[in-house]
Amino acid sequence: IGPSGVETTVYAGDGEYLMXLSIGTPAQPFSAIMDTGSDLIWTQXQPXTQXFXQSDPQGSSSFSTLPCGYGDSETQGSMGTETFTFGSVSIPNITFGXGEGPLPLPXQLDVAKYITLDLPIDPSAFDLCFQTPSDPSNLQIPTFVMHFDTGNSVVSFVSAQCGA
């Protein structure tokens, strides 16, 4: 660690910057998205079902679990400390979240019985349906924001009946 901090390889991805690092003892190499929106490092850890390279905290002799809760509930998993290696520099006891996968949108909104998110075969489209519960006066759906990375494409929204 020098006066300018730790250095590692950074390269451009598809709309994000990626950095090379290793996690654990023995070190497992990964590419990670650089996210300046959070000061906590999140990795996808086993037994997540997504198709990304995954950290295995239980296979590391330097992993230690910490109790936690995360404010916006966008992931589920555990929190711990681990040795991170950037280039040739290893730093022990870095706090990070070991996510077991992103929570689906209905679970994030805590309205799973009122909302469905269908991902069709066409990867350029999806359906988001809000359904009326048996007692509509008790429905409380929080405000949320969805971000779409469309490149140079046009996004259009069509009102339709759910299940249509």
Swiss-Prot record:
* Control of this protein's activity: Inhibited by pepstatin and by diazoacetyl-D,L-norleucine methyl ester (DAN) in the presence of Cu(2+) ions.
Q: Which reaction does it catalyse?
A: Similar to pepsin, but also cleaves on either side of Asp and at Lys-|-Arg
Glycosylated residues, chain numbering? 93
Q: List the active-site residues.
A: 35
Q: Which InterPro entries does the record cross-reference, listed alphabetically?
A: PEPTIDASE_A1, Peptidase_aspartic_dom_sf, Plant_Aspart_Prot_A1, TAXi_N
Q: Which GO terms describe its cellular component?
A: extracellular region
- Please list the residue ranges annotated as the Peptidase A1 domain: 17-164
Keyword Secreted assigned to the entry: answer is: yes
The protein's superkingdom reads Eukaryota
Q: Per the annotation, which location comes first and is thus the protein's main one?
A: secreted
* Tissue expression profile of the protein: Parenchymal cells surrounding the secretory glands.
Query: Keywords on this record?
Result: Aspartyl protease, Glycoprotein, Hydrolase, Protease, Secreted, Zymogen
Keyword Transferase among record annotations: no
Q: What is this protein's pH dependence?
A: Optimum pH is 2.6. Retains 95% and 79% of the original activity after incubation for 30 days at pH 3.0 and pH 10.0 respectively.
| GO MF term (any one) | aspartic-type endopeptidase activity
* GO annotation (BP), single: proteolysis
Could you say which EC number(s) this protein's record lists?
A: 3.4.23.12
Tell me the compartments it is located in.
Answer: Secreted
Give the record's note on temperature dependence: Optimum temperature is 55 degrees Celsius. Thermostable up to 50 degrees Celsius. Retains 60% of the original activity after incubation for 30 days at 50 degrees Celsius.
Q: What does this protein do?
A: Extracellular proteinase found in the pitcher fluid of carnivorous plants. Digest prey for nitrogen uptake.
For this chain, the family text in UniProt reads:
Belongs to the peptidase A1 family.
What protein is this chain from?
Answer: Aspartic proteinase nepenthesin-1
Q: Which organism is it from?
A: Nepenthes distillatoria
